[in-house]
């Protein structure tokens, strides 16, 4: 069936629908950064530092001080898709900076599964790294500063699909053999 079989308004709607669908199909979606990517493609610490990461959701935090109150200067807002770069790499964690010269924020794997993502984390009193979403009181410790999370304790890292694709393409690929014709 061709477009000529449709009346003019329906023909225009069909063409617009086709154009919209084709436009949607070309947009790259930046995926969560899964453990499987790092493991399966043997992504090195140096390569991790070249990837563009983003935060998956909005974060709202208040700096905690002895006064107990919150001033506007103590409110920290990090918007969804704020870009960041890896500064340090551990076996199951990454430290990602979202500001120039910033010390970075910890993200730790949620589990040992291949589908685990790197979620917001913090150092605990005993020096271990805990997921902020697992804490009874969601407080993020950054050096000497402490921040109570009002929103976003469950955020995780997403990665630029384009950058990740470049790393994957840099791996050896088998070209295959063709028979003589």
List the model feature ranges, each with a label.
Residues 39, 64-82:
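N-terminal post-signal-peptidase region of extra-cytosolic proteins
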Residues 30-54:
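Post-signal peptide N-terminal segment of mature Sec-exported envelope proteins
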């Amino acid at each position: 069936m061709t477009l000529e079989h449709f009346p003019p308004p329906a023909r225009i709607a069909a063409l617009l629908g086709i154009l919209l669908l084709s436009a949607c199909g070309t947009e790259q979606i930046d995926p969560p950064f899964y453990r499987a990517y790092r493991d399966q493609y043997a992504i090195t610490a140096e390569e991790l530092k070249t990837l563009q990461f983003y935060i998956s959701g909005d974060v709202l935090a208040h700096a905690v001080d002895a006064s107990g109150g919150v001033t506007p200067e103590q409110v920290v807002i990090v918007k969804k898709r704020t870009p960041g770069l890896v500064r340090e790499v551990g076996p199951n964690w990454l430290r990602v900076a979202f500001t120039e010269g910033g010390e970075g924020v910890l993200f730790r794997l949620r589990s040992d599964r291949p589908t685990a993502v790197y979620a917001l984390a913090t150092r605990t009193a005993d020096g271990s790294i805990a997921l902020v979403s697992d804490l009874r009181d969601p407080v993020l410790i950054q050096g000497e500063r402490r921040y109570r999370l009002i929103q976003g304790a469950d955020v995780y890292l997403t990665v630029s699909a384009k950058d990740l694709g470049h790393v994957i393409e840099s791996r050896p690929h088998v070209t295959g053999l063709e028979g003589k014709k």
